[in-house]
Amino acid sequence: MKLATEKKTTRQKLSIAGMLITMGVVYGDIGTSPLYVMKSIVEGNGGIRNISQDFVVGSISLVFWTLMLMTTVKYVLIALRADNNGEGGIFALYTLIRKQAKWLVIPAIIGGATLLADGMLTPAVTVTTAIEGLKGLPINGNVLVSNQREVIILTVTILSVLFFIQKFGTDLIGKSFGPIMLIWFTFIGAIGVMNLMGDLTMLKALNPYYAIHLLFSPENKVGILILGSVFLATTGAEALYSDMGHVGRHNIYGSWPYIAACLVLNYFGQGVWLLQHKEVAAYQNMTDFNPFFEAMPAQLKIPAILLATVAAIIASQALISGSYTLVSEAIKLRLLPRIKVDYPAKLKGQLYISIVNWILWAVCLAVVFYFKNSAHMEAAYGLAITITMLMTTILLFHYLGRREKRWFLAYVVLLFFGAIETIFFIASAAKFMHGGYVTVLIAFVILFIMFVWYRSNSIKESNTFKSSTVSLLAYKRQLHDLRNETSLPLYTTNLVYLSKPQAEPRGKNMVKKNILYSILDKRPKRAQVYWFVAVNVTDEPYTAEYTVDTLGTDYIVSVQLYLGFKMEQKVNIFIRQIIHEMIHNGELPAQPQHYTTIPNREVGDFSFVIIQEDLSPETQIRAMDKVIVQIRLWLEKFTDTPASWFGLEYSDVFVERIPLVLGRQKAINKYHLKRRQEES
């Protein structure tokens, strides 16, 4: 049976409006790369005084082929086809193949952790780079930003405002993102054409020979490490894949050629400008110039900087929203603790996670204050995302081979792109000592939390006593008698317990013994209907289905909810829908209420019991496993409450604490008490 939900349409057909939305949602990161890619390449080689024609042509060739191979071929042509009901990204890919091998969770959590870590650096890099364009630039005779300190203040202000407005939703301003990004791409493409017309010989950079030649040329003073800067041109490719569910694959197919053309034209235009100005004395000793801004007419610089700032904000917004989505997916897949997820806008796909928002804000500001300028940030940027891309390649290999049975393509992806990404990783690893350790540290913290959460789930499942799970059939008679025991007060009309999903068919109608203990032993709870509800997270993103088994009664209901990994788990709403359907179908009797404000009310009151586990001192498992479980229980103190997570904030909820006993229970019978004989 299906549940009534407001499902977000993830597979949109190709349309002008769809492609416009795509420009605002998908291309923010990769679209702002021209702000710092060539700047980073030139600075890495010692400045404009150390570049030559071969160096510039080779650099542009490296950027071009990186965009073509990594973004166009791997992600647009191959990865976008590996979708989970229209959803993309590393976790969506993982859900497609996780049943094939348990170890695939390793590349999934590593890739997810590094993608989140990289997303924390992106807003700081893009906004700082854009604002630096204002430094020393006269506006109406006055210099608005005269030094780096003022750049930092303005950057921090913009980022703080951006993060502050997240809780109110961004759907209103989000409607303008697409048109603004269309203007941005058209503008940078036009500037590129204008410069390229000055020296069409730059088109020889289309030949990959110049890219390969530069890697081994003496003109290149950093050797293969130049790829650490080149890689910045494609860091947004992973975000492109992750955001597929918001806009649809076909809208990316339709819009990418235009986006790619504008990016390539701008890079080529910057290359021409560098060749034409490498001998200009004014630039010889400049250490912080940006060829992106220098390559345009003076009268366009101020509009360009303002437009770049807005584009950087849009790119940052896309990364922030992407982080919310990534965390939400990880929670549903039981890879991260449950934390409160809000939906501030009318659009169901727009999330807001308060704790994630403020952690991102704090990290972004810390990055700005620590690195102080974009050059230092660029030195740290990109290392984490190379790891994400490698992990995606591993998962793509298993998807193409094991699921699609296209083994030739699978090995091409693994060997070809795996080799390229390994080289990029080696080149980017040199950034570790220049600030790359920041993103590695952030990624490690996220990875540690993911590992603890995933591993503790495995420990609990493998060490819980088999006797801790019982069949409802064995207690059917007792529940019947308790229901009809008039000497006990009616606890509630509908008593609902959230139980753990059990494997079918052996686990059918099986629940944890502590649930029956709560009903029968701890304090007998008399109710008209006993509900045992299990939430199963499916590999599809927007599944909303359920099954029921009444065990041939009208007082026991075993419900299995099947919800997609992107669905809200609003149990209260779903249970009320189910009981109305069951009463309408004659599976349950009506529950008329004598005292009510609702005319013709058929459903009685609900009480929800949530059982909270505390690690018992009687637990006997390996010391390391015990530490992991204890860390998990500590983390749970900072997570969302089950009542909030399951949409029960305004329901009648009771929390019962029970000991969590794992492994073999300590024998206490060997300690036999002997009664003392009292002296007469």
Swiss-Prot record:
Q: Which cysteine pairs are covalently linked by disulfides here?
A: none
- Key words, A-Z: Cell membrane, Ion transport, Membrane, Potassium, Potassium transport, Symport, Transmembrane, Transmembrane helix, Transport
Q: Which reaction is this enzyme known to catalyze?
A: K(+)(in) + H(+)(in) = K(+)(out) + H(+)(out)
For the keyword Transmembrane, the answer is: yes
Tell me where in or outside the cell this protein is found.
Cell membrane
Keyword Transport listed? The answer is: yes
Q: Where are the transmembrane segments?
A: 16-36, 60-80, 103-123, 150-170, 177-197, 222-242, 255-275, 302-322, 351-371, 380-400, 407-427, 432-452
Q: A Gene Ontology MF term for this entry?
A: potassium ion transmembrane transporter activity
Q: How does the entry describe its membrane topology?
A: Multi-pass membrane protein
* Entry GO terms, CC: plasma membrane
Record Pfam families: K_trans (PF02705), K_trans_C (PF22776)
HAMAP family noted in UniProt: Kup
Q: Which family is this sequence assigned to?
A: Belongs to the HAK/KUP transporter (TC 2.A.72) family.
- State what this protein does: Transport of potassium into the cell. Likely operates as a K(+):H(+) symporter.
What name is this protein filed under? Probable potassium transport system protein Kup
Q: Please name the gene that encodes this protein.
A: kup
